[in-house]
Amino acid sequence: MELSFSSKDLEFRDEVRDFLANEYPKHVKEKLDNGEPLSKEDIVDWHKSLSAKGWMGFNWPVEYGGTGWSPAQIYIFQNELGLAGCPPLIPFGVSMVGPVIYSFGNQEQKDRFLPDILNFDTWWCQGYSEPGSGSDLASLKTKAEPVSENGKDYYIINGSKTWTTLAQHADWIFCLVRTDSSGKKQEGISFLLIDMNSPGIEVKPIITIDGDHEVNSVFFTDVKVPAENLIGEEGKGWTYAKFLLAHERFGIAGVGASKRQLERLKEISKDLGDE
């Protein structure tokens, strides 16, 4: 079995390295090299540099604006970014909800949401875990009740989510909600897209043991969400959630970054005289 990269793959690797040498935002690199935290604006600048190159949809098919890269090219891309010490890509749009939308959403939803994900004009967060519903995710209780007003259909959302990463920056949240409690717990879950600026949403920080603010609690009190923001069929959210998790694990593997940190540990070990 031939496991080495092809000449085409090596050319692509060189293209990625050239991009990082010339188009990786210098102020972002300098901050990371100096151990300084990145602002929201820094993170957006980094992602927009990838968007300008046409690489934001690195794992998307061409028909939806992606690169259509091979698995080898995707590996090379992620590996080179990690080895160069680039900020991790925010996965919630491009690696999580984006594939759900282009796989299960209707055409109007694809037209509305996918371009903003590719341009990083919309920052997404993930509304899965709840207090008491983490590993047993299907036990979630955040409720969505259907209502009609002036000829339009909505869901009224009440409940909360927790450990919501970077919700303090997010414009939208993709959210698992309970639309039916009569059957098996997996059967009554639906997948909604919710504007984080909707009245009734409150984000509270969770400060972790290292003093960092990365995760949050998100509270929903009578939040009105247009029914057109439902992905796929009502009650099929568990299927879409599992599909998303497969993309999530792939998107956050961090192989290149792990290699870089391993090399750093080797250097530290040598400096300490540990052979």
List PLM regions with ranges:
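Glycine-rich phosphate/pyrophosphate-binding beta-alpha loops
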Residues: 132-134, 162-167, 209-210
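A structural signal for short hydrophobic beta-strand segments in well-ordered beta-sheet cores
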Residues: 142-146
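Hydrophobic, small-residue-rich alpha-helical packing segments that form membrane-like cores
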Residues: 133-136, 155
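Glycine-rich beta->alpha junctions and the first turn(s) of the following alpha-helix
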Residues: 201-275
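A short, Trp-centered hydrophobic/proline-enriched beta-strand micro-motif
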Residues: 120-128, 176
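A short core secondary-structure module
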Residues: 141, 153-204
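Intrinsic disorder at enzyme termini
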Residues: 1-11
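Internal helix-loop-helix
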Residues: 44, 51-111, 115-121, 166-172
